[in-house]
Amino acid sequence: MQKKISYGKNVYGRKEINAVIKTLNQSTQMGKSVETFENKIAKLFSKKYGLMVNSGSSALILALKVMNFPKGSEIIAPCLNFGTAVSSIMLSNLNPIFVDCDIETLQIDTDKIENKISKKTKALLIPNLIGNIPDWKKIKKIALKHKLKIIEDSADTLGATINKRSTGTYSDISITSFYGSHVISCAGNGGIMLTNDKNYYLRAKVLRSWGRMSTLIKD
């Protein structure tokens, strides 16, 4: 007898159902529940600020927009990647430059990154893929040497650490996703941008809401 195994499945109970009902009875706009969630995820990534959006893909677009790179700048990314990581680069009028992956870990081959760096290179957009993480210590060292920004695409990973230190400590901006098949889900979709840079956070907040920064709680 064949058994159907789904790619991703949401698991929730009465606690989650009650929380949704409570929120619906209050407001469907961004309020205290969103702020609490943003703060909890930011803490997981060792970041000061978290900004909820509709998807991890949108979080990547915001990350690139707030960094405000010149048109035509190059962003290094691994060739094994998710489509929206590449499309976010192109939508920002930037050029993706691909680096091969390690055949054992499926993560970006850090030994090949520097060969791809040019005068136009501005950032490294690197994911934690398929339950594994790249050599973030080495990536950070390369970024500092060449004065590059780091964007961590952690859509597949939530709370990863290296020697009890969050992978988020190595990035300028991290993002994660709450799509239906990811670690936790926001009823099918959702994402968050995370940073320690207040200017990045405030710019992203304006871009998220058509030029407005206000929520139901403050601002």
Predicted segments with their positions:
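Active-site region of PLP-dependent enzymes
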Residues: 29, 157-163, 170-219
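Phosphate-binding glycine-rich loop
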Residues: 30-74, 88-92, 98-100, 165
